[in-house]
Design a protein with these regions (language model features):
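Walker A (P-loop) phosphate-binding loop of ABC-type ATPase nucleotide-binding domains
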Residues: 3-7
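Helix-to-loop junction immediately C-terminal to a conserved catalytic motif
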Residues: 16
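Conserved ABC transporter NBD signature motif
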Residues: 24-34, 40-41
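Conserved ABC ATPase "signature" region
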Residues: 65, 69, 76-94
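Conserved ABC ATPase signature
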Residues: 98-102
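Catalytic Walker B motif of ABC-type/P-loop ATPase nucleotide-binding domains
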Residues: 123-127
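ABC transporter nucleotide-binding domain
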Residues: 139-228
Length: 257
């Protein structure tokens, strides 16, 4: 996870062999990333980039047959996997539609299927829910959880809700570096005692807090302006500890510390 430009997509392109690392070592299951090993690595990986064009004039099924063939999947395995994943993604009834006729969410689901056709050990997905409506976002997140039962799933996002709903482990990037890598619970623990509820009476008091602290939420209420203030120490006498820390609170606290 990280803001736009943090380096998430670049890292994924290195992991999928689209880009070559300029320094350091990368390995997958003990296999070092170098040109002699790229073919072995690619067979272990399924990849869905943030933007993918899947042949608008082909039907869903035709597109998947073609993509599976490029991955070297046998005809029998390919037929079984396409049938299975079309059902798993609720696309069976749409398999004879042209790709250009699909919604954005449906196209992402087809993209997920193509990434799974070679039965990868490692599924890498860049921004899986970008541009999707809330219902499709939930559907994609649930699919990722299902797929993670028997493989490693790595996805990038700047949407905190995606992580909160799907992950137990996460890494946070900023300007090409890792600020954190570990459990979700560990990140929440890091912000413990540093999230405060504060209700101020007017906009001037609110501006003063915003000038000196990170604010994770702000809401106008009947008796003033309610704010969640992130600080190691108590910001002012009106602030009380917030013990209901969200992943968004913890993320903002870490990235702005």
């Amino acid at each position: 996870m990280g803001e736009n430009g943090a380096g998430k997509t670049t890292l994924m392109r290195v992991l999928t062999t689209v880009l070559k690392q300029t320094e350091g070592l990368v390995s997958l299951d003990g296999i070092l990333y170098n040109e002699g090993n790229y073919e072995k690595i690619q067979k272990k990986i399924g990849y869905l980039p943030q933007e993918i064009d899947l042949y608008p004039n082909l039907t869903v099924k035709e597109c998947l047959v073609y993509m599976g063939g490029l991955s070297g999947v046998s005809t029998n395995d390919l037929k079984q996997r396409i049938t299975y994943y079309l059902e798993k993604t609720s696309l069976t009834e749409h398999q004879n539609k042209k790709m250009r006729q699909l919604s954005g969410g449906m196209k992402r689901r087809v993209g997920l299927i193509q990434a799974l056709l070679n039965n990868p050990d490692f599924l890498i997905i860049d921004e899986p829910t970008t541009g999707l409506d809330p219902e499709e976002r939930i559907r994609i997140r649930n699919l990722l959880v299902d797929f993670s039962k028997d493989r490693t799933v790595l996805f990038s996002t700047h949407v905190v809700e995606d992580l909160a709903a799907t992950c137990t482990q996460l890494a946070i990037m900023k300007k090409g570096n890792f600020l954190y890598s570990g459990s979700v619970s560990g990140l929440l623990e890091n912000a413990k005692g540093c999230v405060w509820n504060c209700t101020v009476q007017n906009a001037e008091e609110a501006r003063l807090l915003e000038a000196n602290y990170s604010i994770s939420s702000k809401q106008y209420v009947e008796n003033g302006i309610h704010m969640k203030v992130l600080s190691k120490g108590k910001p002012n006498e009106k602030c009380v500890p917030d013990n209901d820390i969200t992943l968004e609170d913890a993320y903002i606290y870490l990235t702005n510390s």
